[in-house]
Amino acid sequence: MTEPSNSTPPVCSYEGSDYQRTFWETGQRQYEDAVEAIALKRLLPPQGELLLELGAGAGRNSPRYSGYTRVVLLDYSRTQLLQARERLGSAPRYIYVAADVYKLPFVTGLFDGATMIRTLHHMTEPGLALQSVRRVLAQDAIFILEFANKRNLKAVFRYLGGKQAWNPFSPEQVEFAALNFDFHPKTIRRLLAQNNFKIERQLAVSYFRVGWLKEHLPLGLLVGLDSAFQWTGAFAQYSPSVFIRARALGATQAVQRGSFFACPVCEAPLAESASSQTCPGCGNVWDYSEGIYDFRIKPAA
């Protein structure tokens, strides 16, 4: 059997984490959740066939993709996907896949839409991640990307005031914690263009992500203000979070009938089957259990 490749960049795994509850449900993040929902509603197409949700976690955003016939929830953490399945159920509309963004287990050109929310900031090689995403998208597919903005107002003021060493205006990414990165907007735009994406719209999101404001001002007021300011992302991005709607350019090979998955090691096509599969190309076995497809490449012994 061919040994799995270990050449991909490091992965930030939320395996065993109670992130959904501790961060979103009890972590006073109602403001962030609400303004991200507004941004998604503004950027998503009204309808589609098959959406790939990259970094789906426990399925916080998944119900917001109601315009798509089917949604593939992809995350590296199997325990996060188990939480998502518990929340969303086992309806055929949702497909749960444990996999690495750098090694997506799908045939080329499969999806007509994709989202990557609060996920790129864990990528040491964002260009490689975007290249992987583009491969599995059909021509003219819509890609909604969110990234943590290095050039946010707080970082700018701290830098100008001498309280921060790193420069928010320089193009390189900054790792503010292990496997947590902020990116410069120009760098992200360049990487999207290099990987055959055309930006159609940009939104500046979470301008009011300030502890004092969230404690002292009504949630509805903050959400309304953020909603009113999101359009400014069209010409300037100084918010903590930036949302981009991009379109996949260039021809993509047609998907063969019956093809869905692809081996992440050798890229041999695999059927969409609710059972474990042995790759006909390299012999690797990919597990299916508890409603979750597991295509994570295991380190060589």
Regions found by a protein language model. Give the residues of each.
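Short catalytic micro-motifs in class I SAM-dependent methyltransferases
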Residues: 118-122
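A short glycine-rich, Lys/Arg-flanked "PGG" loop and its adjoining helix->strand segment in the class I
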Residues: 127-142
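A conserved beta-strand element that flanks and buttresses the S-adenosyl-L-methionine
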Residues: 115
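Acceptor-substrate binding/catalytic loop of class I
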Residues: 166-187
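Class I SAM-dependent methyltransferase SAM/SAH-binding core
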Residues: 52, 56-103
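A C-terminal cap/extension of S-adenosyl-L-methionine-dependent methyltransferases
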Residues: 162-165, 190, 201-269, 273
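Conserved class I S-adenosyl-L-methionine
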Residues: 1-47, 60-61, 80-83, 143-168, 297-301
